[in-house]
Amino acid sequence: MFSGKENVSFGVLCLLAGCISTSSCLIHLQAKNIGVLLMMFWCFTGLVNKGINALAFNNSLRLAWTLGCDLSAIIERTWQFGLCCSALCVLQRLEGIASLRQAHSTVWDRKRRLLIDFGVGLGLPALQIPMFFIVQPYRLNVIENIGCSAPLYASVPALFIYHLWRLLVSLVCAVYAVLVLRWFMLRRRQFTAALSSQHSGLSQKKYFRLFALAICERVLVSAGQFYVIIQSLQIGGLLPYTSWAEVHTNFNRILFVPVDTIAHSSLLSLSILRWFSLTPAMALFVFFGLTEEAQSVYKARWKALINLCSSKGKKQTDGRESLDLEAFESHGSKFSVLVQRDTVIC
């Protein structure tokens, strides 16, 4: 557990998973599926951050860049919440389409929905960043083989500031999921016509792929969050939050944690959670990275890459086969040039 080879494998897999999670981003960019694009953003950011941490701190506690570690800790504590909020954006849009509220939407309505999506998918995770300092007792944890993380003061305020936000967003997602199913049951015979009448660009198959993706992401993140809450309560329980000054005493200290000093049960929990964090990227790729539309995009990119490489090779070949006139002049050589004149008769 947490061996050098495992860390390298996990780090490389995180980087690959982060990349494949964005494989269909062009399709959703054209369709303006902001919720899915935000999912890809958070998934890519979180997994690349995990991969870099696993590789940089592999059997090491050397901290080369403290500010970068601060940024890494912020990403680590917000990216999964960002996934939950992005799933909520997707379900909000699907419920609006199914309820036919978007049938006569104006330009202002579309702009307002765009602002709401960015406010939920980016604003809520960003809002939690300054609030987290209330329950952050010191600056950083640097854990061998894992990397940078922000410490959490396990207390009643921590439940409301950190844990319950995720559970609350998951609950709202569940409500929207029930509403989507309700509208589908009411209009299942005219559902395809309802989708086309709103110019949503969604077929019934794509609509339910989006629905399944949002539910899957919400369930995966919520399951991980429940596991974290249960583990934190079992290990240390809730500490009394007496005052700001006492909780934040010597705030600038950085705690370096060798992996040998961590209990086996805690190591097992950390190992389960970090491998489980790869599942959102797998869900994104399975639902939208293997479709016919995505495959056509891959083929177009591959052809463009081949054409680019062949054009560069042709330019280099043309340059090698061109006449060196300076060499002819230096040797006093003579050569003739045949110029063909074409006559055009109108």
Swiss-Prot record:
It is found in: Membrane. InterPro entries: GPCR_Pheromne_A_rcpt, GPCR_STE3. Keywords: G-protein coupled receptor, Membrane, Pheromone response, Receptor, Transducer, Transmembrane, Transmembrane helix. One of its GO terms (biological process) is response to pheromone. One of its GO terms (cellular component) is membrane. GO terms for molecular function: mating-type a-factor pheromone receptor activity. The chain crosses the membrane at residues 8-28, 34-54, 71-94, 115-135, 160-180, 219-239, 270-290. It holds the Pfam family STE3. It is a multi-pass membrane protein. It comes from the Eukaryota. CDD domains: 7tmD_STE3 (cd14966). Belongs to the G-protein coupled receptor 4 family. Receptor for the A1 pheromone, a prenylated mating factor. This is Pheromone receptor 2.
